[in-house]
Amino acid sequence: MTELPKTFDPAEIESRWYAHWEDEGLFRPERTGAEPWTIVNPPPNVTGSLHIGHALDNTLQDILVRHARLKGKDARWVVGTDHAGIATQMVVERQLNAAGSKRTDFTREAFVDKVWEWKAESGGQITRQLRRLGCSMDWANERFTMDEGFSKAVLKVFVELYRQGLVYRDKRLVNWDPGLGTAISDLEVETKEVRGNFWHLRYPLADGSGYIQVATTRPETMLADMAVAVHPEDERYKALIGKQVRLPITDRLIPIVGDEHADPELGSGAVKITPGHDFNDFEVGVRAGIKAGEMLNMLDAKAAICQTQDGLVPAELIGLDRFEARKVIVARLKDEGFLVPWTDKEGAEHDAEPRTIQTPYGDRSGQVIEPWLTDQWYVDAATLAKPAIEAVRSGATKIVPKSWEKTYFNWMENIQPWCVSRQLWWGHRIPAWFDAEGKPYVAETEEEAQAEAGEGVALTRDPDVLDTWFSSALWPFATLGWPENSDPTLGGRYSNDVLISGFDILFFWDARMMMQGLHFMKEVPFKTLYLHGLVRAADGQKMSKSKGNTVDPLGMIDKYGADALRFFMAAMESQGRDIKMDEKRLEGYRNFATKLWNAARFCQANGIAASKSLEAPTAELAVNRWIIAETIATVXALDLALADLRFDEAANCIYQFVWSRFCDWYLELIKPVLQGEGVAAAQAEETRAVAGWALDQILVMLHPFMPFITEELWSKMGPREHDLIVAKWPMADARALDPSAAQEIDWLIRLVSEIRAARTELNVPPGARLPLHVRDASAETAXRLIGQEAALARLGRVDQAQGDAPAGGGA
């Protein structure tokens, strides 16, 4: 036994023990023949730093991993980072800009080399921070989504999907980010409410018989208008369907079409249709018989005005930024009499009607997104989604909380083709080559593509890379050695046991892992999907840098210790709810760690050391039989809570047991025994053995939540055969439950509590002793009073019980 200091330093303990665990390989102990248990971390961006959401996500995972390891399973937590195509390229480009250069000053190969250099120098920040949190990850097998083995898996998946007709090239509208110069997914678009305008325009009928009025928030897109739509049952316009209008500025003739997209109750009931720059208009255009290749495009990759295929855009507009062009076009429409003024409530006329507009922004660039018509690679997500839907319906994968199933089904049943090509330099290069006619040849190597194209056919490599989420969708099996490892269960590691994920990446990542895992492995990627909420500011607002209300988890670790932060996350994680950040609670859980530390110091001071047995000692004293039963009941409750992923219930269960039952009551109740107040030496020895055993079980049970302090106390309480991280989880043996001891000690606790309440009510000084009178006591109560005399005297500060009660007194 090593004497514990009066206070403990979390920082010193944390760094020392984490280094020990990792150096000794204790995150992956050799357990030949043990039941495999596997979880994968959502790979953080290699550019990232630990935020409070990471702290929650990884704490919950580590609790499950450590619990599984303590239960004797061959627990493996697969760890790695994501190459984060857009984010990483942005970081490196900013670094180049700061040095006075830009990406296009380099060849593609030279720029990619720069990114690899950056990763080698700066890419390990997030993994160092995960270590500070105490994450017991399999660092010896750390993966990266651009490492050689993983890249082979990505290429194989793309090529196989292409050969199966599930990857194809198509000209469709995409979310184009002009700031980044690439397509982005719907999930990377952030819609914001901004102050904008409705402009009302008058389009003249080609036959000169009148006008049709339309309204738009984007008048500049009229340069690529290809139709005006009206509802086919709208009596005002039925006679106009099939006629043409002559567009102002371009003088283009476009048809009036009947389409139910037009709402007779909204505005004039007539809608301008720009199929090359609006997702709804694209569908209207297709229904009107306009092929994608015929749809007009009026913007270049930087969202500046360009010439349309029909050459009708005036030269003076070409090259203008889209928003500058808007001003010029509105002014010209007004000058030529095609702008209909809007009249406000006071009767004043204005060029436009003020409106709040739902506007799409790129979540990384902050630029307004343009629907842009371009050739891209797509995955047939609807086909891949069908088995993924059925897997959840059948229970092959269970979603917790179950309420998220409806959201999952709704998105998967209405899923759109997945655009997987990105116009970047950093990422998995698409394995496709084109001949002079633009025909693609998809293969894992250029040699295979050339063989398919034929000798002498000149091929050019597709410059695009794959969406980062395409590669990370393979994470549950590509990290385990697929495709080189052809074992369908990947050594018993697939399917993973559970996935812990924020609900915000349910569609980005979780659903796509379901699709790819089922397609290539013929089995679900994880048996359970647990979706947690957000960590919000104390007032319930969403955290954001712009609001200045973010919380740095590393700052919280510095202030309160990693154990306190971890326990806070577990205690506050209630299924289906967000967490409100509360520093007072963090402080409270630091105090909880201090209370445990002081309890261990008390044990040392009273000759209580590490237990010599996993099994509970034999006990005769009621108080010892009681704490053994309470310990076993806590084990059973913890196992149930963790099996149900009720992290808050698990944390509360162990907290109440340690603070209240063990520290506040048991240690106080055994003081008379330990200090020899009229008890036999055998009883004191029994009590030391039971107390040491109970403290050991506490350290084991609490270890998944607070690994650092528990490991430190485990090592200091006496010699051990092994570290706590690989100890054995207590057995919930129902035979240890003892109703008679529970009744007696619960009676004692109630009696002491009543005495203390009476003392407080009567303002009795804390040090004053009171006489204890008893009336009409049963034989059982009388026996208990005698047996618990020392405990009553110490805890209630009362004298020996007298069998008479004063007149008017209570029994």
Swiss-Prot record:
Subcellular location, record wording: Cytoplasm
CDD domains on file: Anticodon_Ia_Val, ValRS_core
Key words of the record: Aminoacyl-tRNA synthetase, ATP-binding, Cytoplasm, Ligase, Nucleotide-binding, Protein biosynthesis
Tell me where the sequence motif 'HIGH' region sits in this chain: 44-54
Residues binding ATP are 545
Q: Which GO terms describe its biological process?
A: valyl-tRNA aminoacylation
PROSITE patterns reported in the protein's UniProt record: AA_TRNA_LIGASE_I
Recorded GO molecular functions are: aminoacyl-tRNA deacylase activity; ATP binding; valine-tRNA ligase activity
Q: Where is this motif: 'KMSKS' region?
A: 542-546
One family from Pfam that matches here is Anticodon_1
Q: Which domain of life is it from?
A: Bacteria
Task: Supply the EC number(s).
Answer: 6.1.1.9
Query: Which reactions appear under catalytic activity for this entry?
Result: tRNA(Val) + L-valine + ATP = L-valyl-tRNA(Val) + AMP + diphosphate
Please state the protein's primary subcellular location: cytoplasm
- What GO cellular component entries does it have? cytosol
Subunit and interaction comment: Monomer.
Q: What does this protein do?
A: Catalyzes the attachment of valine to tRNA(Val). As ValRS can inadvertently accommodate and process structurally similar amino acids such as threonine, to avoid such errors, it has a 'posttransfer' editing activity that hydrolyzes mischarged Thr-tRNA(Val) in a tRNA-dependent manner.
The domain comment in this protein's record states:
ValRS has two distinct active sites: one for aminoacylation and one for editing. The misactivated threonine is translocated from the active site to the editing site.
Q: Which HAMAP family match?
A: Val_tRNA_synth_type1 (MF_02004)
Sequence similarity: Belongs to the class-I aminoacyl-tRNA synthetase family. ValS type 1 subfamily.
Name of this chain's protein: Valine--tRNA ligase
Q: Which gene encodes it?
A: valS
